[in-house]
Amino acid sequence: MPLNLEDKRAIVASVNAVAAEALSAVVADYRGLTVSQMTELRSKARETGVYLKVVRNTLAKFAVKDTEFECLNDALVGPTVLAFSKDDPGAAARLIKDFAKDHDALEVKALAVGGVTYGAQDIDVLAKLPTRDEAISQLMSVMQAPVAKFVRTLNEVPGKFVRTVAAVKDQKQSAA
């Protein structure tokens, strides 16, 4: 059933609003996936906070116009599913990569971060990015390490003194 002009405008506005706020995007070819597999992909996308949409390529090109994902226009050929990450730049890449492991029919065409397009071979780089919580945890451990070493160093001085006094005491007891 063909879409009327108002429906097309609504789709373009919806995808454009998401693209304007997104941190990264993945374009994939879903040709060969069954309806149940697409439903599974959509449910996993909802669980991970990824916006996933199958859009006609001409509408997708209008939707990403004037966003940092306009660079993906060349990849919008054939059956295309768009996946946008809002909070975690690697979420969409992880979702598509993990789903593609089990379903060979899903093929990554391109991905974009910060207005730069990357090829399908670079999905591992984006997928391996830590989540926000993991990055904060790593930062906190890096910041905490010098303080912890300093505290251990400070504790070593009285500990060494106590061990020295105990050694002198043992030496005097054995001499007596």
Swiss-Prot record:
Keywords: Ribonucleoprotein, Ribosomal protein, RNA-binding, rRNA-binding. It holds the Pfam family Ribosomal_L10. One of its GO terms (molecular function) is large ribosomal subunit rRNA binding. GO terms for biological process: translation. InterPro entries: Ribosomal_uL10, Ribosomal_uL10-like_sf, Ribosomal_uL10_bac, Ribosomal_uL10_bac_type, Ribosomal_uL10_CS_bac. Belongs to the universal ribosomal protein uL10 family. This is Large ribosomal subunit protein uL10. It comes from Alcanivorax borkumensis (strain ATCC 700651 / DSM 11573 / NCIMB 13689 / SK2). The lineage of its organism: Bacteria, Pseudomonadati, Pseudomonadota, Gammaproteobacteria, Oceanospirillales.
